[in-house]
Amino acid sequence: MGLEQHPGGGLTVWAYRLVAPYTFERVDIPEKTSECLGDRQVLLHFLAAGICGSDLPGFRGAKGRLAGDTGLSAAEMDGFPIHEVVGEVIASRHRSHGVGDRVVGWASGFDGLMEYVVTDGDGLAPYDPALTPQHAVALQPLACVLYALEQLPSLKGSHIAVVGQEPIGLLFSYVAKAFGARQVTGVDPIDRGGIGEEFGVDTIVRATSDRWVSHLDASDRPEIVIEAVGHQVATLGHAIEATAFGGTVLYFGVPDDDSYPISMRTMLRNNLTLKSGVTLDRRRVLRAANEFARKHPELLTAYVTHTFGVDEVQAAFELACRPTPERIKIAIVE
């Protein structure tokens, strides 16, 4: 790893590129410098990345909406699809980030799987230096969860259901319980019986969401249902069907389709509220995530269950695609 001479002159750095479905290729690309930076951007030296569920369609070869996703068999974009990153600032045009700072946040170009990453400084924040990079990278999804829950009614004393208990769903369960939820129900066909309680889940439902809804008693419907699956249209409808009268549905899962069929009759007759949206105010919520993790020191070590080196990217993504009960968050480190 490190700088090498480019055949055409100059230095090169490593990057990964999806060249076919389920297939990464390591490539050498020209070194990036401060001259690559626009206003409020920073240049990071890669320290760690986290694999998000939203990265997996790209790994499988699905065509995304990014302008550069023009490959014949896969995206063929340097660094794609990683957006959860930890890095050391090596050049900056953002007044809040200086050379040598270690920061966590978003690779704004979804190109974080490379040695040098150019990204928007407004999506980065410093983190507790006691954290290792593989644990610090989990602050990014935690920030997303904290921001999303800010958009909902108070969780205190409420019954919350989280559809999907993959890494982001388990984070929702944990934070909901920490914020005072009376009961947290976690729904997933993966067996989370061994770890659900550790993440605040009171009732672990090992079933698909349609099966869960079909057996849900009218008196036990949650006031808030969080859809944390995404990438297909069915589970949002199940979340709406499951929600108690006057309740709220949060659609957090990333949509792969433009249009989702939902029952407006159920929405209307049950006085439901449907919320969705992306994470804004990113530097603030990254700082909030750092503080939340400080108050809950057991969280990040329990959450990041598997760590791979940058020479093991293929294996890391293959594990992320497998429904494995003991696997939660996967980090990739330098």
Where would I find each of the regions flagged by the language model?
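Short, well-ordered loop/turn sites that connect or cap secondary structure elements
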Residues: 96-97, 154, 243
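C-terminal hydrophobic helical "lid"/dimerization subdomain
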Residues: 2-11, 237, 283-334
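Mid-domain Rossmann-like dinucleotide-binding core that forms the NAD(H)/NADP(H) cofactor-binding site
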Residues: 135-207
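Short amphipathic alpha-helix with an adjacent loop that forms part of the alpha/beta core around
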Residues: 210-220
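Glycine-rich beta-strand-centered segment in the early N-terminal region that forms part
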Residues: 34-50, 64-109
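Glycine-rich phosphate-binding loop and adjacent beta-alpha segment
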Residues: 202, 232-295, 334
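NAD(P)H dinucleotide-binding glycine-rich loop of Rossmann-like/cofactor-binding domains
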Residues: 72-84, 102-163
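A short N-terminal beta-strand-loop micro-motif at the entrance of redox/enzyme domains
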Residues: 2-6, 20-48
